[in-house]
């Protein structure tokens, strides 16, 4: 099925028996509806006037139209006299960025309308959705509520792709932490955590939508089609559990990272302490030797113990310095050994 205009609008009439037929405009769609079947209307980035033009023939409520124009709405389902309004989210993950786009659906007795804005990074969304509907031809011909299931199932499949991409990133981060913590960036964990929180929030509300559908809150969804929606609910429940698991994994990775960094800092601190201890030992050993050499270098001392007065004065002085240095070394080593025993 091909869109009737360049990826902004596509109108189809689904006859009671036959393939969906593209129609050029709204007037032609309403004319075709007189022959039975139902209409499938897609609008990407519509203006307010485009939505208000649908208000009269399909009974779109003004509040629902406002929701379509507001990008900050949460997923929900609301029943109006002429239709059921469903707000679902579409996920798209690319270049480590999570895009969440709002998809609004109006389901009536003989029509289904899809409205969406800001198809971030996914301009072919509508074309692929129409291709999917072509593959699900038998379900599409069964009624507008079955087409609603096809659309929602497609949106849930895209959630699976997004969660799969996040899972691959989490696995890569785990390998980085274990193999080479130096190349690991903790901000990657924070980014993934934010993405998972957004996904979890969206899925929480979307599960509530499926709960209301499955308990027959909408009169425009037949009892026979409810079994199809239960399958979507099962998938969302699975994704919800996976997001919780991945959040726990990220928390564990952060604890692991902090623990490894603490160990690394401890090792560096111990290394610094060893260096300082060695320098201190060298300084302590040479302090008395420096004192003796200072005394020995005095002119008065040299006059009293010079070679002409005492031939062995200088050799004896050197031996005394060596004895003092060796004695200082062994005393320091003994004290260090005693400190280690006390610690143990």
Task: Kindly give the residue locations of the regions a language model identified.
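Hydrophobic alpha-helical transmembrane segments and their immediately adjacent juxtamembrane loops
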Residues: 237-344
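Peripheral, non-transmembrane regulatory/ligand-interaction domains of membrane transport proteins
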Residues: 1-224, 228-231, 235-245, 304, ...
């Amino acid at each position: 099925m091909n869109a009737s205009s360049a990826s902004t609008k596509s109108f189809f009439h689904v006859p009671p028996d036959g393939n969906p037929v593209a129609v050029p405009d709204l007037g032609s769609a309403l004319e075709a509806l007189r022959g039975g079947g139902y209409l499938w209307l897609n609008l990407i980035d519509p203006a307010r006037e485009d939505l208000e033009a649908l208000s009269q023939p399909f009974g779109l409520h003004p509040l629902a139209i406002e929701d379509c124009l507001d990008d900050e709405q949460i997923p929900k389902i609301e029943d109006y006299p002429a239709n059921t309004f469903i707000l679902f989210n579409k996920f798209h993950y690319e270049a480590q960025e999570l895009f969440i786009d709002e998809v609004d659906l109006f389901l009536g007795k003989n029509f289904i309308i899809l409205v969406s804005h800001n198809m971030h990074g996914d301009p072919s969304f509508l074309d692929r959705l129409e291709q999917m509907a072509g593959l699900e031809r038998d379900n599409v011909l069964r009624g507008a509520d079955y087409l609603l299931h096809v659309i929602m199932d497609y949106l849930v499949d895209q959630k699976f792709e997004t969660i799969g991409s996040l899972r691959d990133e989490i696995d890569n981060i785990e390998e980085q932490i274990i193999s080479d913590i130096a190349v690991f960036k903790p901000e990657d964990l924070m980014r993934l955590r934010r993405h998972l929180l957004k996904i979890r929030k969206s899925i929480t509300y979307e599960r509530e939508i499926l709960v209301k559908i499955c308990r027959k809150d909408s009169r425009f969804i037949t009892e026979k089609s409810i079994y199809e929606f239960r399958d979507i609910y099962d998938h969302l429940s699975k994704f919800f559990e996976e997001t919780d698991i991945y959040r726990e994994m990220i928390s564990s990775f952060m604890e692991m990272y902090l623990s490894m960094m603490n160990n690394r800092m401890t090792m560096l601190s111990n290394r610094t302490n060893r260096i300082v201890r060695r320098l201190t030992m060298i300084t302590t050993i040479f302090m008395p030797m420096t004192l003796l050499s200072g005394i020995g270098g005095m002119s008065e001392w040299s006059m009293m113990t010079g070679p002409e007065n005492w031939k062995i004065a200088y050799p004896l002085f050197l031996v005394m310095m060596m004895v003092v240095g060796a004695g200082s070394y062994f005393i320091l080593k003994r004290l260090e050994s005693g400190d280690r025993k006390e610690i143990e």
